[in-house]
């Protein structure tokens, strides 16, 4: 009986260990693969503030360019491309969470007009699938299918991201009209400087939290530094903790001021936002325009023929 209980206890411990290990793995992988979109999705109902600012800029403090290209106009119920370009120098390396250097990832958020959404797979042509590559898009939330997010994905391969978009049809959706609509985009390259809870990442600059003398610098194995700042007037000590990644700019015995830079700024990435306009074109207007252009061309042809006929009559009368 005792052996049976012992075996059962060992079995329970093994099962618990496996469950915890799987849980940690899943959480870790999820946080790595979905870091950029999740930060915005968890904290903001809408990624674009009333001021027009996209919330990704709250964590990615450096400003970098981003570009978007869409057709000037589209017909209803049509699949088209929205191309987002996130340029950066692929030779540069960023500071990773463990303090080592690595390549930059990119991420993007595309804010479409109401009614526009990600094209279903069966509507995407093979040519467009080849342009998209091996990446997947997701809606910002179940109620906001017009807002698409992606990332992080390797920047070396996806500095240009092609979104397959399906235009709405006013005939089936009463809230959609044949108008000119704005499209907004935000794109980042590299890690952010601030986490959603307000704490700093190791991909930013660190400042002194007190004035005084750097009495000691303790290097923590794989954990950065502890900088001990002593106030000469009363001997009070303040410890500033620097994570692995940023390079120190101060040394022991150096006098420093409040907010003085303790490290360099390791950030090589940044965030940018842009916009474009697209017209949802009424097919009947297009047909009317084509009919008008055809009428103009025919009128010109008849005018030329009439002119030549008149010239022939004049020439005949002169000869007669």
From Swiss-Prot:
<dbReference type="InterPro" id="IPR036826">
    <property type="entry name" value="Cyt_f_lg_dom_sf"/>
</dbReference>
<feature type="binding site" description="covalent">
    <location>
        <position position="56"/>
    </location>
    <ligand>
        <name>heme</name>
    </ligand>
</feature>
<keyword id="KW-0249">Electron transport</keyword>
<dbReference type="InterPro" id="IPR002325">
    <property type="entry name" value="Cyt_f"/>
</dbReference>
<keyword id="KW-0813">Transport</keyword>
<comment type="similarity">
    <text>Belongs to the cytochrome f family.</text>
</comment>
<keyword id="KW-0479">Metal-binding</keyword>
<dbReference type="InterPro" id="IPR024058">
    <property type="entry name" value="Cyt-f_TM"/>
</dbReference>
<keyword id="KW-0732">Signal</keyword>
<dbReference type="Pfam" id="PF01333">
    <property type="entry name" value="Apocytochr_F_C"/>
</dbReference>
<feature type="binding site" description="axial binding residue">
    <location>
        <position position="60"/>
    </location>
    <ligand>
        <name>heme</name>
    </ligand>
</feature>
<dbReference type="GO" id="GO:0009055">
    <property type="term" value="F:electron transfer activity"/>
</dbReference>
<keyword id="KW-0602">Photosynthesis</keyword>
<comment type="function">
    <text>Component of the cytochrome b6-f complex, which mediates electron transfer between photosystem II (PSII) and photosystem I (PSI), cyclic electron flow around PSI, and state transitions.</text>
</comment>
<dbReference type="GO" id="GO:0020037">
    <property type="term" value="F:heme binding"/>
</dbReference>
<keyword id="KW-0934">Plastid</keyword>
<keyword id="KW-0472">Membrane</keyword>
<dbReference type="Pfam" id="PF16639">
    <property type="entry name" value="Apocytochr_F_N"/>
</dbReference>
<dbReference type="GO" id="GO:0009535">
    <property type="term" value="C:chloroplast thylakoid membrane"/>
</dbReference>
<keyword id="KW-0408">Iron</keyword>
<dbReference type="GO" id="GO:0015979">
    <property type="term" value="P:photosynthesis"/>
</dbReference>
<keyword id="KW-0793">Thylakoid</keyword>
<dbReference type="InterPro" id="IPR024094">
    <property type="entry name" value="Cyt_f_lg_dom"/>
</dbReference>
<feature type="binding site" description="covalent">
    <location>
        <position position="59"/>
    </location>
    <ligand>
        <name>heme</name>
    </ligand>
</feature>
<keyword id="KW-1133">Transmembrane helix</keyword>
<feature type="transmembrane region" description="Helical">
    <location>
        <begin position="286"/>
        <end position="306"/>
    </location>
</feature>
<dbReference type="GO" id="GO:0005506">
    <property type="term" value="F:iron ion binding"/>
</dbReference>
<keyword id="KW-0349">Heme</keyword>
<dbReference type="InterPro" id="IPR011054">
    <property type="entry name" value="Rudment_hybrid_motif"/>
</dbReference>
<comment type="subunit">
    <text>The 4 large subunits of the cytochrome b6-f complex are cytochrome b6, subunit IV (17 kDa polypeptide, petD), cytochrome f and the Rieske protein, while the 4 small subunits are PetG, PetL, PetM and PetN. The complex functions as a dimer.</text>
</comment>
<protein>
    <recommendedName>
        <fullName>Cytochrome f</fullName>
    </recommendedName>
</protein>
<keyword id="KW-0150">Chloroplast</keyword>
<feature type="signal peptide">
    <location>
        <begin position="1"/>
        <end position="35"/>
    </location>
</feature>
<keyword id="KW-0812">Transmembrane</keyword>
<feature type="binding site" description="axial binding residue">
    <location>
        <position position="36"/>
    </location>
    <ligand>
        <name>heme</name>
    </ligand>
</feature>
């Amino acid at each position: 009986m005792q052996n049976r209980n012992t075996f059962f206890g060992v079995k329970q411990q093994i099962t618990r260990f496996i469950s915890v290990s799987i849980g940690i793995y899943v959480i870790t992988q999820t946080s790595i693969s979905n870091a950029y979109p999740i930060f915005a999705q968890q904290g903001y109902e809408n990624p674009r503030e009333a001021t027009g600012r996209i919330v990704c800029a709250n964590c990615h403090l450096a400003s970098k360019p981003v570009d978007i290209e869409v057709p000037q106009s589209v017909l209803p119920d049509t699949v088209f491309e929205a191309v987002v370009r996130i340029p950066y120098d692929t030779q540069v390396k960023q500071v990773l969470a463990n303090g080592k250097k690595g390549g930059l990832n990119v991420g993007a958020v595309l804010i479409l007009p109401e009614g526009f959404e990600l094209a279903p797979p069966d509507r995407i042509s093979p040519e467009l699938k080849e342009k998209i590559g091996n990446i997947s898009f997701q809606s910002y939330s179940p109620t906001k299918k017009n807002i698409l997010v992606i990332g992080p994905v390797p920047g070396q391969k996806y500095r240009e991201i092609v979104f397959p978009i399906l235009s709405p049809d006013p005939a089936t959706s009463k809230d959609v009209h044949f108008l000119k609509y704005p499209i907004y985009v935000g794109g980042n390259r590299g890690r952010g400087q601030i986490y959603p809870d307000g704490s700093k990442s190791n991909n930013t600059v660190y400042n002194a939290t007190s004035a005084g003398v750097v009495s000691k610098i303790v290097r923590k194995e794989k954990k950065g530094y502890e900088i001990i700042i002593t106030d000469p007037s009363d001997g009070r000590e303040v410890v500033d903790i620097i994570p692995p990644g940023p390079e120190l700019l101060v040394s022991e015995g150096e006098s420093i001021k409040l907010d003085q830079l303790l490290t360099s700024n390791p950030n090589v990435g940044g965030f940018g936002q842009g916009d474009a306009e697209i017209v949802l074109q009424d097919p009947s207007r297009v047909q009317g325009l084509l009919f008008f252009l055809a009428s103009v061309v025919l009128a010109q042809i008849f005018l030329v023929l009439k002119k030549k006929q008149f010239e022939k009559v004049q020439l005949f009368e002169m000869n007669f």
